[in-house]
């Protein structure tokens, strides 16, 4: 891990500098895609989804409505509306009004990465999916999402950068600590489930 001097920590290791953890506003990311912590009905209500709707405009919700419900653990892609990001990938880690499970988080993260790669995207930014309204534990979220990102980068992919954009210093610290633990594991086990 290396501090670039601009408040962003850059991870350097076997997956080089392709996973980055930072504090900030996900909706301001100038990446090919940002990920929405979505419910399976793709209703942009509160939390991250609400912020995306407010900044990205109603077009994103209209596109979600046209897609309709998707299974928990899957993801869907829409335009970025008025956001800097070209696309929003909606990771359905819970049912509307429900909670997030480890399995749903793992699958929706992996599916989001696959959708980005299928579209040939170079950069994607994730929030801490499921830790807000859905009540999933931040530490477990960090472990699952970082492992999925590392696993994805081990295969051939168009993705060059995977950002984890956390809303405060505490969340960022949890993700940084999780990443250090994962990287300290013996070779071949760092991306095991």
Where are the predicted features?
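Short, intrinsically disordered low-complexity segments
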Residues: 1-3, 17, 52, 180
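Phosphate/ribose-phosphate-bearing ligand recognition and processing surfaces
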Residues: 96-193
């Amino acid at each position: 891990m290396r501090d670039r001097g601009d408040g962003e920590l850059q991870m350097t290791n076997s997956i080089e500098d392709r996973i980055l953890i930072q504090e900030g506003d996900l909706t301001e990311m100038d990446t090919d895609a940002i990920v929405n912590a979505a419910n399976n009905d793709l209703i942009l209500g509160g939390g991250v989804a609400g912020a995306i709707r407010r900044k990205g405009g109603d077009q994103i919700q209209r596109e979600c409505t046209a897609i309709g419900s998707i299974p928990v653990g899957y993801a869907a892609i829409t335009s970025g509306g008025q956001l800097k990001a070209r696309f929003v990938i909606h990771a359905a880690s819970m049912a509307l009004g429900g909670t997030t499970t480890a399995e749903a988080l793992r699958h929706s993260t992996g599916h989001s990465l696959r959708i980005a790669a299928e579209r040939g995207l170079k950069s994607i930014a994730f929030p801490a999916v499921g830790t807000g309204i859905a009540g999933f534990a931040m530490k477990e979220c960090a472990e699952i999402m970082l492992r999925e990102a590392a696993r994805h980068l081990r295969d051939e992919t168009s993705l060059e950068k995977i950002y984890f954009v956390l809303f405060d210093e505490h969340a960022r610290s949890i993700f940084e600590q999780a990443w250090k633990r994962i990287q300290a594991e013996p070779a071949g086990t760092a991306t095991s489930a």
